[in-house]
Regions:
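Residue(s) in the substrate-gating loop at a strand-loop-helix junction
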Residues: 2-277, 283
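Catalytic core segments in nucleotide and nucleic-acid processing enzymes
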Residues: 1-47, 277-438
Length: 438
């Protein structure tokens, strides 16, 4: 599988060989560790939607040295020398997870809710999770989508051509004709249009396939790339990515290319699903887990609750904290309505404490203020915070529901905390549904 380090969120990476056997840390050799630190420091701290401090933090521990902590983003970082660091989400499964195969399967299911590829592509990739690392799974999904396009037939278009022909067609290019054919008056240097597959979209795909051919360490992926390249024999490799991406045509005829063009940008231009764009030669393919978790839970809630007559909407932006100036929009993750009843659910990709311990289970004060604002502005007492279940909570087994209640003369706010089991999401949300309908 090549040179890689596979870690989970909240793992701590070090380069001190004396602690290489310590289970509290993930050990990385000095050269790769310094390249990783360089990558982190090259990312602008003022990135619009993603602060590097939410992803990787560099700390110093006495005796241990520099420590890199990982959180909130999942995916792949490829360092300049080809070494890969693959970050997987910390998902509680309740049992051993050899090679993180089940974690990868759950993560792919979650990722499918973002519609970056058709669901079938994620399902097929999931079958290979036990023998492919995360990067190879992403490559495999891209190849599946190319295969789907090839089966339907790659599109041709009228392409501008120039050539010195023995017959006349199109438009004579006078200057070039005089240069080339002063002693060959039987020939014509002309410009003409030809219906041909050598269009921008196909050139981009061919360039991506050739790049992935060099990068992949998977025998399965390498074989698939060879097969697919035969379908692009009449297509040139893109040599000017910017020009070809600008030349993409978006219409009904090219709908099958849309996802492939997005992912080709990821592989060719290092255009990420985050705003991270470091100045080093390192490349990254990263997904914000807060967004992935929110999208997945919202998708699954619609499946579970809609048949029971609930109207479920996500990221609803209809209320403001200050109505007169329409400022500070309130956007709860999920709003459910039925027969005049309103329930607000907000997802939080955070690891709560298993016990209260005087710290409110680790729930932030800012989150509670936010829930209180939702309650007042939406005129409902029913507020739910949805956290992923973790090992500490799982160990406690059956427990009293966690809730916080605030009452005054005219209204009541009840914030309920629920732990979602991502490995058994349907079963977990059915239990939540039963609690909502008690």
């Amino acid at each position: 599988m090549g040179r890689l380090l596979e870690v989970r969120e909240f793992d701590r990476i070090i380069c001190n060989a004396e602690y290489s056997g310590d289970t509290k840390y993930k050990y990385l050799e000095e050269k790769e560790f310094r390249n990783l630190v360089k990558f982190i420091r090259s990312i602008p701290g003022n990135a619009m939607d993603a602060d590097i401090l939410d992803f990787m933090r560099i700390d110093y521990r006495r005796n241990v040295g520099d420590v890199v902590s990982v959180k909130n983003y999942v995916g792949v970082i490829q360092l300049p020398d080809g070494f890969q660091i693959q970050v997987l989400p910390k998902i509680s499964l309740g049992e051993e997870d050899e090679n993180y195969a089940r974690t990868k399967k759950v993560f792919l299911r979650m990722l499918s809710s973002l519609k970056k590829f058709p669901e079938k592509v994620f399902q097929e990739a999931s079958l290979k999770a036990d023998r492919m690392n995360l990067y190879e799974l992403f490559v495999n999904m891209y190849l599946q989508e190319v295969r789907r396009l090839v089966k339907k037939g790659i599109k041709s278009d009228y392409v501008e051509q120039e050539d010195n022909l023995s017959f006349y067609k199109g438009k004579l290019l006078v200057n070039k004709h005089l240069q080339m054919n002063l002693v060959h008056q039987e020939r014509f240097f002309v410009a003409f249009q030809e219906f041909h597959p050598n269009r921008a979209e196909n050139r981009i795909i061919k360039a991506t396939l050739l790049k992935l051919q060099k990068l992949t360490n998977s025998v399965d992926n390498a074989k698939e790339i060879l097969k697919l390249l035969t379908a692009f024999e009449m297509v040139d490799k893109s040599v000017n990515y910017t020009k070809d991406f600008a030349g993409i045509v978006s219409n009904r005829n090219t709908r099958d290319y849309e996802m492939l063009m997005q992912w080709s940008k990821v592989f060719l231009l290092n255009k990420n699903f985050t705003t991270f764009s470091g100045d080093t030669a390192a490349q990254s393919l990263l997904f914000p887990m807060e967004l992935v978790y929110e999208s997945y839970v919202a998708q699954q809630m619609k499946k579970v609750m809609s048949p029971a007559g609930w109207q479920v909407s996500s990221q609803e932006k209809k209320k403001y904290l200050f109505d007169n100036s329409k400022s500070f929009a309130l956007k709860p993750d999920i709003v459910m309505k039925r027969d005049g009843r309103i329930v607000i659910l907000d997802t939080k990709w955070k690891e709560l404490d298993g016990k209260e311990n005087g710290s409110n289970y680790g729930i932030s004060q800012a989150d509670m203020y936010q829930m209180y604002a939702y309650s007042k502005k939406y005129g409902t007492s029913e507020i739910w915070l949805l956290y992923p279940i973790n090992d500490a909570v799982r160990k406690e087994g059956n427990r009293e529901p966690v809730k916080f209640v605030s009452e005054d003369k005219n209204s009541k706010t009840e914030v309920n905390v629920y732990f979602v089991d991502l490995d058994k999401i349907e079963e977990s949300l059915e239990i939540l549904k039963a609690r909502l309908e008690e």
